[in-house]
Amino acid sequence: MAGSRPGKSQVRLTCVSRCATVSRSLDEPVSGTAATATTWLLLEQPGPWGAKALTSSHLDRALGRALEAAADGTGVRIALIRRPGRHADPGGPADRQVYAAHTVPGRVWLHRATIRDPRRLLGLDFAALGAGDHRSFGAALGGRPHRGDPLALVCTNGKRDRCCALLGRPLAAELSASGVRGVWEVTHLGGHRFSPTVLVLPYGYSYGRAGAHTIKEALDGAQEGRVVVEGCRGCSAWDRPGQAAELAVRSVAGEYRAGLLSVVRTDGAAPRWEVTVGHADGRRWRVSVAQSASQPPRPESCGAAVLGTPARMDVVAVRELRPTALAS
């Protein structure tokens, strides 16, 4: 009608809207949206971070480029971390924490090292780390198994997306102030529009639109070997169809123990996949996953020049396979 006021959704869906606000208002599903990595390599780097933090922080730029090249195609994802609220860079030699975490179920591990010279990371065997072999982490960095609490990595990099700073930094501060140990700020987890986003290690499950209560529950669950599915984006060990399929099986089967479900096979290609999820006890499920474009168009990140229709993963069906069907 001429002269009528635009609807609430019309006002929100502009390129200047905060991407997380719009995504939440449209109830965009978070399942099947996690960043993919079989292994995470996390380097403590105080001070400010740029949008591409490995080459736009106080870390030596040439070293950042070399680390990116070394990790390319190996399944290792590198990110910088810092303590909540501690953004000053004192300069000079200082001990840095380094973590490596392999997230493939059945072979999960989390190791930690303390170093002064980050160039030592170039001595790592990235291909082996991506495949789950942690020996070079011990040999090059003196790393050992992490014996402390699970880690909560909160994306706070406002140079990457303002929602990460506006929503992530308060969450990291709240968790830290409440006595939760193992909380770090991290440079990038993908999916800015799901801020605050959090990665929980060692099991590698990411969470979107995360509140302090959910993350505390997820950390308690990780400590007990249990996966919290509320707000879960998926396990980084799997691709996006696999992430959605695994979470669907957890809900259908009521199986929340970590490490017992694996994506054993994926057939098909976009926009439709048949994903086989296996249990350690021998059970199997076939999950139909369909990709579609999210509607209406919305900002996929803050400051995006155009509105987008991000892909979403919808679970169409979950079917438990009987022994006679396993060979098909």
Give the role of each language-model region.
Residues 2-328:
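Histidine/cysteine-enriched polar flanking segments
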